[in-house]
Amino acid sequence: MFIKNLPHKTVERLSQYRRALLLILSKEKTHVFSHEIAQMLHITPVQVRRDLMLIGYSGNLRKGYDIKELIDLIGKIIDSERGQRVAVVGLGNLGKAFISYFKGKRSKLSMIAAFDVNPEKINRVFDGVPCYHINQLPEIIKQNNISIGIITVPSEQAPEIAEALVLSGIKGILNYTPKPLNVPAYVYLEEYDMITSLEKVAFFAKKNDERFK
């Protein structure tokens, strides 16, 4: 199921909604209201309702949203019917954490390969994911129909790795280095800079600290 021109931020929130809904479902609830979802994610109920209207879903005024139904709908929108395969490039602490944390979290996303240059990591298996030498990247990506790459290498190596991923046929990249990347328009790029995020938190923490003195 594909909805044209769905805003990037809405897609991001849909993923968060599904995670929240799965948690609520585990508590044996069958329905939920927008204000309950909003409270869990620290956003407004209006935002929740707007996002769900964009995907054509509305709840019952008395009972709220059917949790299982909404989880299934979000899955049809976000997930690929055939599933997608993911590779991590850079098997340091962050790369290993990705593999370990992600294991079994989503049935439609499979972490199936890792790449590194460290001989102590190559030809080993980490949490079920085999690690290959970086020189094997084009071959393994194409052979296993991998469409998503996660970059967790030292920042100076990121542009070269991104280029190799693009040339190998990758369609989406998650860049976890502070180095901005340039990729073709047909490759979706998501960049996450932990330093920037921490500085943002520090700014607002300082602001709150000053406000309540």
Regions found by a protein language model. Give the residues of each.
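Extreme N-terminal segment that seeds HTH/winged-HTH DNA-binding domains in transcriptional regulators
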Residues: 1-30
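Phosphate-bearing ligand-interacting subdomains
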Residues: 17, 22-25, 129-213
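HTH-adjacent hinge/linker in prokaryotic transcriptional regulators
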Residues: 31, 35, 40-85
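Glycine-rich Rossmann-fold phosphate-binding loop(s) that bind the pyrophosphate
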Residues: 91-92
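N-terminal Rossmann-fold NAD(P) dinucleotide-binding loop
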Residues: 95
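NAD(P)-binding Rossmann-fold cofactor-contacting core
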Residues: 106-127
